[in-house]
């Protein structure tokens, strides 16, 4: 491609500077290159000051290298003629032009066709069949719009790979911000290439021809499953630059049965490629889209964001729901997107699978179809929905979830699913410049203001969008580090709360670890987790769930599995992500500065094991470690292993709550030192392996559009006070939504809220930065050695008094001649007053201490439309007396104090309310105690009366007993008298009259009886 002409370049640059042109934006057509940049850098220079100007470079860059593509350079135009690779390379070698010759005017439209103003709406291509050839992208490289097969790999379906090559852009991403020290700013990539580059090209061409010839030769053996030798030779010369309508689409793993695949389609053909990881796939998709869709970031487009949760189905016929199983398929406008795993059973069918798609073209209808697993099976039922209903304002924020009746199925058949769709309007990337700047500079302020106002789901979505945007700009690592430190300060050193709550910090850390540690999870847990999911061995150790005879065998099996998982984790330090190591090291340093060094390992443990490794073991399908949810038996095994690993990381033995796991306490004691050593290793920064600079990739405009839509939804329900503290973000969001230019600039530091300003001033802290509009709120610091006159002169906004103004000395006229005169050395004289400064001149000496002199800029709006700058343009009274700003400053301080007192009053009122609530509770408790006391008193009285009655009864019985004893004594005495009387009668002589006269007896007893 020929370089753009200077005339065209001059047309693309604006003549006057404006806030939108403070940064240099690169377009796909013919913009100029950034000075000395290796990367696509629309947002790479946000860290510098807004007024910083980049050095100008030549508008005619040198020829570019064929092996390395500068990402910050404008992409290539689509080629109209099919050029052979060898012809292009040898032509470059034989005739290296030092400067490109200008082409004739009649050939310019033919070589560089103008991009279409309204490109055709892309449609989702037809899904590939399961037996389609899938090519390993590790054997390819991207050279001049061609996917060139380097060779050395035999055809084989879905074979594992150890390493992987990458495209030119991927190589640059892996290298970080490395720059050659000998390279001057403004040189392009071919200028730094050595002379051995052509010889390397010769060797490459020779090897390509030899391998092509070897592949074309007939060989003995069975044909490959991926295709014939001719198909491989055709693919080795695939020139995508000569094709029309080249599109790149990521493929869901369920379509081909293999993860991390993408499809390249063009008019008349398509190819499928597999990658080693999701990060590698994203880099390849980005590089290919930059190559074949160069204007994607510079045009407005509409894309669809879709999330579908397929839960369960009911009411299907027994014959249909039986073996071999039923799948649920997702169709969008007649194109198959994904399918669930097969489920079989006589009752309800459970899937519980989630599908998420981004960057889909505008679509109208979504269809969920239930289909049998057998070949050529018919559709058992379907659900058809219009996406306009799901994207309507009245649609629920969490999505539409219900039982959808199945069309074409028996009555009562239904599918339970949750669907959430959103149509995004993606603007050109330069329209989001201010939004990206605000997020880059003030993400901590934004998270702190929105934290108490968001539910858990909104926090998760906002944190994911922020992490993706900042990862694309290279600032996600700083975001996670700062939020983790803030979470540590919020918890106040309480270990039980570290990373266990649903906050923006925890959600951001989860999203960042999922993005960074995908390869790490695959390398560490992928193989062992897949083996455990496929195993049929039982590891249940709960005595209530397994026989006692099998319990020792199950315990030994679980211990061996935990040993295997733990060994893979502690030996994974060699491929541990360096980005996470830097974050963990920063957290430990923050704990050390706070005097709580013990919390450093706890932070690492809570983030790495509690939020990443153990959840990946529990739910491997959510982290890409398994294609489907495990069966109940393996799921129970994974749950027990996750419990053991988590307790080992927390150094917490099993207690009475899980007494059946007590046999694993010896395992925890044995491997505790190794776990502590691993936590120390991952928190150490390896300088050689640590990444530097930009590490992100992806569609930044799309991620910014998602973030803009979420923030608009959040700010629509936010209170006005919180909005004011986040200015100018609401103004930026409103301008982007209305399609108006953003007329504000993002400061490097936002002013503190009034309460924080008062607290910082009362604590004796000096403000680091203050906006000009906030200067009247603060009294300048005055030392005791300054005189009154110097104090008056040093006042920030006071004008000099009329009596202090000195007459201006008129400059001496300068006479010029035709020749340059010899100037005599000027004598230094005492100035009688300040020189008049002409309009537009620069101040070379110390500025006077009066109000700064400024002039209007033609690039800025003369009447600011933002509310916080209108008061600065209001005319002020020129006759304002000296020191009138003092009461204003004092009033501002008093207002701050009043605001602080109001806050204290609110706190005290809340305290009084809480105390009154406690008093009411104590009063109610006292009433209850009184009632209980009365009840006890009544019961005591009743008991005492019963006791008295029983006591009276006992006294009567005693009296009766005494009477009986008395009667017994009387009877004994009477008996004794009778005995004596009988004896006396027996001894005395009887007379005649004695037999007829009886002896007199004693008086009767007291009770009236006679004896």
Swiss-Prot record:
Subcellular location(s) per record: Cytoplasm; Cytoplasm, Cell cortex
Ranges of Polar residues composition bias in the record: 871-882, 987-999
Domain PH: 197-293
Acidic residues composition bias: residue spans: 100-117
Gene3D superfamilies in alphabetical order: GTPase Activation - p120gap, domain 1 (1.10.506.10)
Ranges of residues in domain C2: 284-404
Site, Arginine finger: residue positions: 500
PROSITE patterns assigned to the protein according to its UniProt record, in alphabetical order: C2, RAS_GTPASE_ACTIV_1, RAS_GTPASE_ACTIV_2
One Gene Ontology molecular-function label: identical protein binding
Tissue localization of expression: Predominantly expressed in cells of hematopoietic lineages.
Coiled-coil positions: 888-988
Residue numbers bearing the Phosphoserine modification: 18, 51, 164, 166-167, 170, 224, 228, 231, 787, 790, 988
Region called Disordered, residue ranges: 1-38, 52-136, 151-197, 209-230, 756-885, 987-1011
Low complexity composition bias: residue spans: 7-22
Modified residues (Phosphothreonine): 234
First-listed, main subcellular location of the protein, grouped into a coarse class: cytoplasm
GO biological process: negative regulation of Ras protein signal transduction; positive regulation of NK T cell proliferation
Extent of Basic and acidic residues compositional bias: 179-190, 792-808
Start-end of Basic residues biased regions: 81-95
GO cellular component term of the entry, any: membrane
Ras-GAP domain ranges (all copies): 474-682
Functional description taken from the UniProt entry: Functions as a Ras GTPase-activating protein. Plays an important role in the expansion and functions of natural killer T (NKT) cells in the liver by negatively regulating RAS activity and the down-stream ERK signaling pathway.
Name listed for the protein in its UniProt record: RAS protein activator like-3
Gene behind this protein: RASAL3
